[in-house]
């Protein structure tokens, strides 16, 4: 009973039910539209369907230890002294893959302005000889891919290691640039299914808004680039 009642007392669910009462009381189209938007983007069942699609169609890729190519770790900010959690997750993920592969001496290409903390974090995790190539690829993902396009051999298979919320854009850009590549995503809590219990269809969850915010930013960024890259060159500068 506690698990059923408790979610209704959270501020966002009090707002949801208050909004429903206001929509019923005043019968305004705008209130109903706001209620529908707030409910659909916050509902756990709806968000879990989106997570299932994304996890299976965008980032689900099984790594084969017999892989004989190289790896690319896209930078995730930081400074000369510190690494953000997203960078640590990507480096941990690529280290796990490197320690599985049968490739005798694979290469890891890391695109970041601050190479020293990335390399210092990665090297103790490695259990085999690895060729490390760290360089500043550019200010954005699009700059990084422009640099990678001219720097890497397109005939060598690649695994791109990035964060799950970044995987859609990376997979599309790798395909567009003609790389023989797959994407391995370091997981975050945002893309893990939320518990959808007895109160699921009557409440909203804040983590679902975070999910849709990240997906909106990811898809918007990529499709703006797709519409403009043919007649602009900002991503090359």
Q: Model-found features: residue ranges?
A:
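Short, surface-exposed patches at the edges or C-terminal ends of soluble domains, predominantly
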Residues: 200-237
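Hydrophobic membrane-insertion alpha-helices, especially the h-region
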Residues: 18-23, 28-44
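Membrane-embedded alpha-helical segments of integral membrane proteins
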Residues: 1-24
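A structural signal for short, hydrophobic/glycine-enriched beta-strand patches
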Residues: 43-212
């Amino acid at each position: 009973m506690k698990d059923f009642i408790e979610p209704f007392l959270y501020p966002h669910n009090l707002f949801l039910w208050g909004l429903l009462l206001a929509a019923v009381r005043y019968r305004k189209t705008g209130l109903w539209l706001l209620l529908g938007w707030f409910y659909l983007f916050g509902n756990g069942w709806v968000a879990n369907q989106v997570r299932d699609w994304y996890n299976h169609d965008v980032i689900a890729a099984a790594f084969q230890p017999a892989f004989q190519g190289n790896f690319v770790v896209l930078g995730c900010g930081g400074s000369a002294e510190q690494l953000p959690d997203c960078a640590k997750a990507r480096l941990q993920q690529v280290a796990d893959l490197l320690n599985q592969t049968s490739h005798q001496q694979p290469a890891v290409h890391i695109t970041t302005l601050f190479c020293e903390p990335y390399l210092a974090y990665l090297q103790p995790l490695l259990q085999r000889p690895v060729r490390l190539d760290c360089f500043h690829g550019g200010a954005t993902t699009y700059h990084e891919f422009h640099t990678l396009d001219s720097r890497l051999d397109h005939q060598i298979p690649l695994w791109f290691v990035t964060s799950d919320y970044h995987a859609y854009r990376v997979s599309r850009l790798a395909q567009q640039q003609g790389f023989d590549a797959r994407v391995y995503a370091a997981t975050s809590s945002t893309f893990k299914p939320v518990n959808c219990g007895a109160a699921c269809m009557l409440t909203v969850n804040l983590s679902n808004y975070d999910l849709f915010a990240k997906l909106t930013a990811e898809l918007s960024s990529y499709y703006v680039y797709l519409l403009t890259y043919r007649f602009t060159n900002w991503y090359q500068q």
